[in-house]
Amino acid sequence: MQILLLALTIGLAYAHQTLDPSEINGQWHTISIAADNVEKIGEGGPLRGYFHNLHCYDGCKNIGLTFYVKLDGNCQRFDVLGAKQEDSDVYVAQYSGTNHFEVIGKKEDAIAFYNHNTDETGKETKMIVVVARRDSLTEEEQQKLQEVAGEKGIPKDNIRYFRERDTCAQ
């Protein structure tokens, strides 16, 4: 039920399927981030990532993520590799702690990820990150994202929409 609702709410065609590298590989940018710990995604927060590239390896058993985080006003590049867990659609990656993430929706020009981060101190953060090859979500997608975020325990006030692209690595 939740998967069906998610497909409808974010407006992305979702199905448990093998990811196709031709659909994933290439340039993407962050258009929305939501988290239950809003300080983690605020300006200068360690989980406020500005995505630039996704790449599948080994038939998408591994996903490479290239993103930038602005720390102390400076852009820092991160190249992170997520390894798919056996018998699961969940990937595990190390960045600002341990991350368990999965694709919860995708279509040609947008991908939504759900991420569960446990930082080095043990603090847990639930997140939704939407990356795209377009500049924004539609109003309907924004409204539905708020509903899904609420179901994941993320207050709608903690959703950040990126109206413009980041200035890192231009």
From Swiss-Prot:
The keyword Secreted applies. It comes from the Eukaryota. Disulfide bonds join 56-60, 75-168. It is found in: Secreted. It holds the Pfam family Lipocalin. Residues 1-15 form the signal peptide. One of its GO terms (cellular component) is extracellular space. Expressed in submaxillary gland (at protein level). Keywords: Allergen, Disulfide bond, Secreted, Signal. Not N-linked glycosylated. One of its GO terms (molecular function) is small molecule binding. Its main location: secreted. InterPro entries: Calycin (IPR012674), Lipocalin (IPR002345), Lipocalin_CS (IPR022272), Lipocln_cytosolic_FA-bd_dom (IPR000566), OBP-like (IPR002448). Belongs to the calycin superfamily. Lipocalin family. This is Lipocalin Cav p 3.0101. The lineage of its organism: Eukaryota, Metazoa, Chordata, Craniata, Vertebrata.
